[in-house]
Amino acid sequence: MVSVKVLFFGEAFQLVGKREETVEFPAETDYEELRRIILEKYPALSKIEKVMMLAVDQEYANPGDRFELERFTEIAVIPPLSGG
């Protein structure tokens, strides 16, 4: 297990009430496991579960992606993007 920083933006921040927190993840993991762990730890995110995106070290993550997490890894929880 490795402790990594999880960052919350926009509606994710509003739902969780924190900008960032350190969370334990397996050092070798995949996109699906990252989502599962984050949603278990922060059930309020279920409101945006179907539309939220994850980024690992400032790169968008996709289903099927695998990761080797390290102590300085950052995971961002990004709500649906909107604009005009």
Curated annotation (Swiss-Prot):
Keywords of this entry: Cytoplasm, Molybdenum cofactor biosynthesis, Nucleotide-binding, Phosphoprotein
GO molecular function: molybdopterin synthase activity; nucleotide binding
Localization annotation: Cytoplasm
Recorded metabolic or biological pathway in which this protein acts: Cofactor biosynthesis; molybdopterin biosynthesis
PTM: C-terminal thiocarboxylation occurs in 2 steps, it is first acyl-adenylated (-COAMP) via the hesA/moeB/thiF part of MOCS3, then thiocarboxylated (-COSH) via the rhodanese domain of MOCS3.
Cytoplasm listed as a keyword: yes
Residues carrying Glycyl adenylate: G84
GO cellular component: cytosol; molybdopterin adenylyltransferase complex; molybdopterin synthase complex
Gene3D superfamilies for this protein: 3.10.20.30
CDD domains tied to this protein: Ubl_MoaD (cd00754)
Biological processes annotated in GO: Mo-molybdopterin cofactor biosynthetic process
Modified residues (1-thioglycine): G84
Keyword Phosphoprotein: yes
InterPro entries for this protein: Beta-grasp_dom_sf (IPR012675), MOCS2A (IPR044672), MOCS2A_euk (IPR028887), Mopterin_synth/thiamin_S_b (IPR016155), ThiS/MoaD-like (IPR003749)
Family membership: Belongs to the MoaD family. MOCS2A subfamily.
Function: Acts as a sulfur carrier required for molybdopterin biosynthesis. Component of the molybdopterin synthase complex that catalyzes the conversion of precursor Z into molybdopterin by mediating the incorporation of 2 sulfur atoms into precursor Z to generate a dithiolene group. In the complex, serves as sulfur donor by being thiocarboxylated (-COSH) at its C-terminus by MOCS3. After interaction with MOCS2B, the sulfur is then transferred to precursor Z to form molybdopterin.
Subunit-level organization: Heterotetramer; composed of 2 small (MOCS2A) and 2 large (MOCS2B) subunits.
Name the record gives this protein: Molybdopterin synthase sulfur carrier subunit
